[in-house]
């Protein structure tokens, strides 16, 4: 373990269009190679697509995140030469980060034409509790449930 103190959390600026911290975080998750304006265009395009089909885009985004957030995950723990998958609860900040990452990863694997359409599709699916990101969460929960016997190895 490092003896250095934990780095202070930097304050994230809200996004310029909706003034939302959540959207700013999501834009940063979508961003590749530091191209923030491209990531903004993708996310705002996805929200516009959602508003055309389902109504309020931000509400759909929040519902999607809520449906994808994992409550528990497994961490590897080595005990006497054997490695156990130990279920641990996920902190709220990490829950959000994982949910965003899983949604973006699932969207990138979809077949639609543009990234905005892929992201819109994945967000709408996640809001309806279906799609790859929700499946990933279910798999994570299933793994934790299967390894419940090793929960006493928690640290």
Swiss-Prot record:
CDD domains the UniProt entry points to: uS7_Bacteria
Family annotation (Pfam families): Ribosomal_S7 (PF00177)
InterPro entries to which the protein is assigned, alphabetical: Ribosomal_uS7, Ribosomal_uS7_bac/org-type, Ribosomal_uS7_CS, Ribosomal_uS7_dom, Ribosomal_uS7_dom_sf
GO cellular component, one term: small ribosomal subunit
Top-rank lineage group of the source organism: Bacteria
One function term, GO molecular function aspect: tRNA binding
The keyword Ribosomal protein is assigned to this record: yes
UniProt entry tagged with the keyword rRNA-binding: yes
Keywords for the protein's UniProt record, in alphabetical order: Ribonucleoprotein, Ribosomal protein, RNA-binding, rRNA-binding, tRNA-binding
Record's subunit section: Part of the 30S ribosomal subunit. Contacts proteins S9 and S11.
Record-linked HAMAP family: Ribosomal_uS7_B
Function: One of the primary rRNA binding proteins, it binds directly to 16S rRNA where it nucleates assembly of the head domain of the 30S subunit. Is located at the subunit interface close to the decoding center, probably blocks exit of the E-site tRNA.
Protein family: Belongs to the universal ribosomal protein uS7 family.
Protein name: Small ribosomal subunit protein uS7
Organism of origin: Thioalkalivibrio sulfidiphilus (strain HL-EbGR7)
